[in-house]
Amino acid sequence: MSISAVVFDRDGVLTSFDWTRAEEDVRRITGLPLEEIERRWGGWLNGLTIDDAFVETQPISEFLSSLARELELGSKARDELVRLDYMAFAQGYPDARPALEEARRRGLKVGVLTNNSLLVSARSLLQCAALHDLVDVVLSSQMIGAAKPDPRAYQAIAEALGVSTTSCLFFDDIADWVEGARCAGMRAYLVDRSGQTRDGVVRDLSSLGAILDGAGP
């Protein structure tokens, strides 16, 4: 079947995140490691309704304010936590926007499927990385209620794009999630930015055009 849509993982494929800087700032303000903040963020998201999570009507400031109360932070630390700009830790890879533009130029739907929604909404980080205008649908595992490599995650993004899984081309930097996409019927590639191109593996997204032409890895 011909390709009708291209689906990308977000972190590690389209965007990178400076975890060291984020860890330093979060620990400095809260005294907690980033992993603990992530755990609490996941619990807070689970308390939202599906509609709230999907349209992202609950701003992150609500979570941070709630966290500050739980930790009994002083007013200065609370204000600093709420004002902390997590978007400043994120950026798009140089090959990301050209790949999205190539998909759009060919008339393909573009989706993003992420298991991560750490301290930022699924779409907001793409907006910070100047990629959001080229993406049709963004879904996170919290929105779906299933995470990669669960087949339901891949089915959800395909349905949201209005296509079948078998007409999707998929890119991820986690091997198990790539295999999950293949099991769901997608044509999938592992993005290994530190390794060498080999069968089913690409170094970055610059090979998207060649793959769509049938000449890629």
Curated annotation (Swiss-Prot):
Keywords: Hydrolase. The keyword Hydrolase applies. The active site is at D9. InterPro entries: HAD-like_sf, HAD-SF_hydro_IA, HAD_sf, S-2-haloacid_dehalogenase. Its EC number is 3.1.-.-. CDD domains: HAD_sEH-N_like. One of its GO terms (molecular function) is hydrolase activity. It is an enzyme of class 3 (hydrolase). Able to hydrolyze geranyl diphosphate (GPP), farnesyl diphosphate (FPP) and geranylgeranyl diphosphate (GGPP) to respectively yield geraniol, farnesol and geranylgeraniol. PANTHER family: HALOACID DEHALOGENASE, TYPE II (AFU_ORTHOLOGUE AFUA_2G07750)-RELATED (PTHR43316:SF3), HYDROLASE, HALOACID DELAHOGENASE-RELATED (PTHR43316). Belongs to the HAD-like hydrolase superfamily. This is Phosphatase MT3486. It comes from Mycobacterium tuberculosis (strain CDC 1551 / Oshkosh). The lineage of its organism: Bacteria, Bacillati, Actinomycetota, Actinomycetes, Mycobacteriales.
